[in-house]
């Protein structure tokens, strides 16, 4: 029992009550901690919490098949000690290993078996990292101290701020002459046609009353010469384009 010295809390599972007090006292002296007592036939009805004991000692181990329950009752790296067992130790060791215990060993001279609970809690998980992590490259990381901001006012020149001439936006004006293309779609063909008609009407303007040359006092209300000074009879007067068009 010297290998269990320093364990704080132990459980002694007994089958024979004869000299039980002496065996429990010997375990207390060996460990230096507390020792709880439980009957092997009442083990399945016990309600011990998980990870309650540092050491569990069982006498006559063939009388219990609750090794999984004992595994849960032990703390991580807790010890399981069996003595006074009957039969081949190999079969008992195999059963203990299949229940989750590790580091199982036999002391044939003392007729004892010792096993250990793994150093982690039952049901716990750990992250496994099999692949090597490649160092991340800060490709898109920009330092504000090293990067200068662009002044928006410097993006435009004075030429960019000038408004373009509407006449220069027409496709037909690329030739340098005011001549409409064959399939004109910019409106220049209609504009030139209106100018042509207006010019013809201006040149052929005639007086219907014969008093147009006398001045506004003698002109009709719809006379195209209204507002113009008097002129000599037969004198050719060129009218502005807007005077020959309707105001509505």
Swiss-Prot record:
Family membership, please give it.
Answer: Belongs to the anamorsin family.
| Region Fe-S binding site B, annotated ranges | 209-223
Motif residue range(s): Cx2C motif 2? 220-223
Under the subunit heading, UniProt states: Monomer.
Motif interval(s): Cx2C motif 1: 209-212
| Pfam families cross-referenced by the UniProt entry | Anamorsin_N, CIAPIN1
Question: Which purpose does this protein serve, as stated in its record?
Answer: Component of the cytosolic iron-sulfur (Fe-S) protein assembly (CIA) machinery. Required for the maturation of extramitochondrial Fe-S proteins. Part of an electron transfer chain functioning in an early step of cytosolic Fe-S biogenesis, facilitating the de novo assembly of a [4Fe-4S] cluster on the cytosolic Fe-S scaffold complex. Electrons are transferred from NADPH via a FAD- and FMN-containing diflavin oxidoreductase.
Localization per record: Cytoplasm; Mitochondrion intermembrane space
According to its UniProt entry, the protein's GO biological process terms are: iron-sulfur cluster assembly
Q: Which residues bind [2Fe-2S] cluster?
A: 172, 181, 184, 186
Question: Mind listing the UniProt keywords for this protein, alphabetically?
Answer: 2Fe-2S, 4Fe-4S, Cytoplasm, Iron, Iron-sulfur, Metal-binding, Mitochondrion
**Coiled-coil region(s) at which residues?**
none
GO cellular component terms, semicolon-separated: mitochondrial intermembrane space
Q: Binding of [4Fe-4S] cluster: at which residues?
A: 209, 212, 220, 223
Enumerate the InterPro entries for this protein. Anamorsin (IPR007785), Anamorsin_N_metazoan (IPR049011), CIAPIN1 (IPR046408), SAM-dependent_MTases_sf (IPR029063)
A molecular function GO annotation:
2 iron, 2 sulfur cluster binding
Q: Does the keyword Glycosyltransferase apply?
A: no
Which residues lie within the region annotated N-terminal SAM-like domain?
Answer: 4-130
Q: Which domain of life does this protein belong to?
A: Eukaryota
What name appears for this protein in its UniProt entry? Answer: Anamorsin homolog
